């Protein structure tokens, strides 16, 4: 596809001549799609265009690149056919469509493009056919035969029963008193029709579809001696009301009418511009819980956000949607507007009950479901659409619901449901305090967080922000989904329960019996002060079992030389904080010893120097501890002086710690993750 994307402009230029070259005049989206259709039909002869027909219908489209490969329009399969491009015709015995259509007047051209019903109705009026056959220059947007036959019987009867007034006026509304080709049909422009100078709304979309009062151009740019004919798929009628006026007169918009008046948006909806209003009906409002609806209606800012979320920044006719589009609302949210067959969808749901109600300043689609933006929601409501239901139940059980439904400015750090696959912690005072430390005292946005920032929690703790290349973490927990910003609170979906730091690295090691031998070694090497003071350390902490696994001779040699012991221990300490969520395929972390540690993560297993880490992310106020089951060796350990004066005392302390470890090993069992987390909070 990438190669095709580079070659396609060149191929188009070769196929179509100088007008298609990059140096030539700019082409409209319609012309670009037509060029692509011509390129696809070239193998069938000159001036042949590929056309996609929607199976089971008579709807045809010139094909763009995406549709050509997908063979779908609005999710429905299409078949490819080949026909003469506009302005050309077949010649018996010749390949393709080599002959240009002979030019005739507008009336005759109506027959050429297949608009025979429009031609017939033109005949019935006294004045119009002479104009179409006489001098001048006109554009006619001619309804197809199917367009006339699909009119309601009462509408058609009213037209044909008064041909020299009603029918004549209707046909004149389809005409402009000059020649207008598709290149001149600009998105959002208005053309002055030949009926009382009433405006015709033009929209020219990036996908090449052109609409006239939301009727799609089927065959465009058919030249005549006195103008041009564009075939369209609907009979269009005059538009006199703006969006606000339509809201005022439609009974189904009673609630919407009151909401617009309360928000002050009526000025926008009756002014100039081109908008799409996804207008919720009374039934749409009734589907919302009364408590939620009353809260929003009583909050001017939330109400304005709610209504703005139903207004698109430009007019979007239904016929312009042939695949999913991401469209931004005035509120700032992006809606996925798509189609499935004849149904329009919003965010994948077929909630549009009436489409293409035209206004002078846009178009209205009726919807039967309210589109509440995140900016109008409470934290509870934000969570309902996120993968955090288990965490929300914990907050509710712990009596913290008021924080999630009120007007308190805060940020909720909610672990995703998979975090609790092995169960949830018991609800008690310590769990409640832990949950309070998942609430930040301000409404934040992740895009404004920076490395080293500290955040105050409702539980009284300070949490640190760590920014890594591919992740953004708060203590040991990293943000797993885009944050959702509500009316007062912001929801961060986190990848694990957060562990607030409870002491220095030395405090953490001393409080865990698994590290008693390491603590003894640190004390003997004179590193206690280093790991107690302020700093940013990552400690790969060998457990007692790791030391006991060393050959006895090697262990004695190590403990007999304090400088070498310090050198090896420093190799276990990185000079920055690296939590597991910040580890990518490979991170090289500089140690206090000077050499670098190679830290990696694969299939949720963290390794250091290819040795698996037994437990990650034991948080400390000056760093993080990762438990490992082996003692790491520097890549090149230079000879050190023995430091004999410390050797005996160091070895004795180490032996005592080792003995203590063996004595307690059989009775001390690893607690479940939540129990260990809660135990740490005691200190």
Curated annotation (Swiss-Prot):
One GO biological process term: cell adhesion
Subcellular location as annotated: Secreted; Secreted, Extracellular space, Extracellular matrix
InterPro entries documented for this protein: Adhesion/Biosynth-related (IPR050904), EMI_domain (IPR011489), FAS1_dom_sf (IPR036378), FAS1_domain (IPR000782), TGFBI/POSTN (IPR016666)
UniProt PTM: Gamma-carboxylation is controversial. Gamma-carboxyglutamated; gamma-carboxyglutamate residues are formed by vitamin K dependent carboxylation; this may be required for calcium binding. According to a more recent report, does not contain vitamin K-dependent gamma-carboxyglutamate residues.
Boundaries of every FAS1 domain copy: 103-236, 240-371, 375-498, 502-632
Keyword Transcription regulation: no
Modified residues (Phosphoserine): 37
PROSITE patterns membership: EMI (PS51041), FAS1 (PS50213)
Membrane-crossing residue ranges in chain numbering: none
Disulfide bonds: 49-85, 74-339, 84-97, 214-317, 473-478
Any one of the GO CC terms: extracellular matrix
Cited Pfam families: Fasciclin
Modification S-cysteinyl cysteine occurs at: 65
Domain EMI stretches: 45-99
Gene3D superfamilies: FAS1 domain
Residue ranges annotated as motif Cell attachment site: 642-644
Protein's UniProt keywords contain Signal: yes
Top-level lineage group: Eukaryota
Key words, A-Z: Cell adhesion, Disulfide bond, Extracellular matrix, Gamma-carboxyglutamic acid, Phosphoprotein, Repeat, Secreted, Signal
Function: Plays a role in cell adhesion. May play a role in cell-collagen interactions.
Description of how the protein assembles with itself and partners: Binds to type I, II, and IV collagens.
Name this polypeptide is given: Transforming growth factor-beta-induced protein ig-h3
């Amino acid at each position: 596809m990438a190669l095709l994307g580079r070659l396609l402009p060149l191929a188009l230029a070769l196929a179509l001549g100088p007008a298609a070259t990059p140096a030539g005049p700019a082409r409209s989206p319609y012309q670009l799609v037509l060029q692509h259709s011509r390129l696809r039909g070239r193998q069938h002869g000159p001036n042949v265009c590929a056309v996609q027909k929607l199976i089971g219908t008579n709807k045809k489209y010139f094909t763009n690149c995406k549709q050509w490969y997908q063979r779908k329009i609005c999710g429905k399969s299409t078949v490819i056919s080949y026909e003469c491009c506009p302005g050309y015709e077949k010649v018996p015995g010749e390949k393709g469509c080599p002959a240009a259509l002979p030019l005739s007047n507008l009336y005759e051209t109506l027959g050429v493009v297949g608009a025979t019903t429009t031609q017939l109705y033109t005949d019935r009026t006294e004045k119009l056919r002479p104009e179409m056959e006489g001098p001048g220059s006109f554009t006619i947007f001619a309804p197809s035969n199917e367009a006339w036959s699909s009119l309601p019987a009462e509408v058609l009867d009213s037209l044909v029963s008064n041909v020299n007034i009603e029918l004549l006026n209707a046909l004149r509304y389809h005409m402009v008193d000059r020649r207008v080709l598709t290149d001149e049909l600009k998105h959002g422009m208005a053309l002055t029709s030949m009926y009382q100078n009433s405006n015709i709304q033009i929209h020219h979309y990036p996908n090449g579809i052109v609409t006239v009062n939301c009727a799609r151009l089927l065959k465009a740019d058919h030249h005549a001696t006195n103008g041009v004919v564009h075939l369209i798929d609907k009979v269009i009628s005059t538009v006199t009301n703006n969006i606000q006026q339509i809201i005022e007169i439609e009974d189904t918009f009673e609630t919407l009418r009151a909401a617009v008046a309360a928000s002050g948006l009526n000025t926008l909806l009756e002014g100039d511009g081109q908008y799409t209003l996804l207008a919720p009906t009374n039934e749409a409002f009734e589907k919302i819980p009364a408590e939620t609806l009353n809260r929003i209606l009583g909050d001017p800012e939330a109400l304005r956000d709610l209504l703005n979320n139903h207004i698109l920044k430009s007019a979007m006719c239904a016929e312009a949607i042939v695949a999913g589009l991401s469209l931004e609302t005035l509120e700032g949210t992006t809606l996925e507007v798509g189609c499935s067959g004849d149904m329009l969808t919003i965010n994948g749901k077929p909630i549009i009950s009436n489409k293409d109600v035209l206004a002078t300043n846009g178009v209205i689609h009726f919807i039967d479901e309210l589109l509440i933006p995140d900016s109008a929601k409470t934290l509870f409501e934000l969570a309902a659409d996120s993968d955090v239901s288990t965490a929300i139940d914990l907050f509710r059980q712990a009596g913290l619901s008021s924080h999630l439904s009120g007007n308190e400015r805060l940020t909720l750090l909610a672990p995703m449901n998979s975090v609790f696959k092995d169960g949830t912690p018991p609800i008690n005072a310590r769990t409640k305090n832990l949950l309070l430390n998942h609430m930040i005292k301000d409404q934040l946005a992740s895009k404004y967080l920076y490395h080293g920032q500290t955040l105050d929690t409702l539980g009284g703790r300070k949490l640190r922000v760590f920014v890594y290349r591919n992740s953004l973490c708060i203590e040991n927990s990293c943000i797993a989904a885009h944050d959702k910003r509500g009316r007062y609170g912001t929801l961060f979906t986190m990848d694990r329960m957060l562990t607030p730091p409870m002491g220095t690295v030395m405090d953490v090691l001393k409080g865990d019996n698994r590290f008693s031998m390491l603590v003894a070694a640190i004390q003997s090497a004179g590193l206690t002060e280093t790991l107690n003071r302020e700093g940013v350390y990552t400690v790969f902490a060998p457990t007692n079992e790791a030391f006991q696994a060393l050959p006895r001779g090697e262990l004695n040699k190590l403990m007999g030389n304090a400088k070498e012991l310090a050198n090896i221990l420093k190799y276990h300490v990185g000079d920055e904080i690296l939590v597991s969520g910040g580890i990518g395929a490979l991170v090289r972390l500089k140690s206090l010893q000077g050499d670098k540690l190679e830290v990696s993560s694969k299939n949720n297993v963290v390794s250091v120097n290819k040795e698996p880490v037994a437990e990650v992310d034991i948080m400390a106020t000056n760093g993080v501890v990762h438990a490992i089951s082996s003692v790491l060796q520097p890549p090149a350990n230079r000879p050190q002086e023995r430091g004999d004066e410390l050797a005996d005392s160091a070895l004795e302390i180490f032996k005592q710690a080792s003995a203590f470890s063996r004595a307690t090993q059989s009775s001390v069992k690893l607690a479940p993750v939540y129990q260990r987390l809660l135990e740490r909070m005691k200190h």
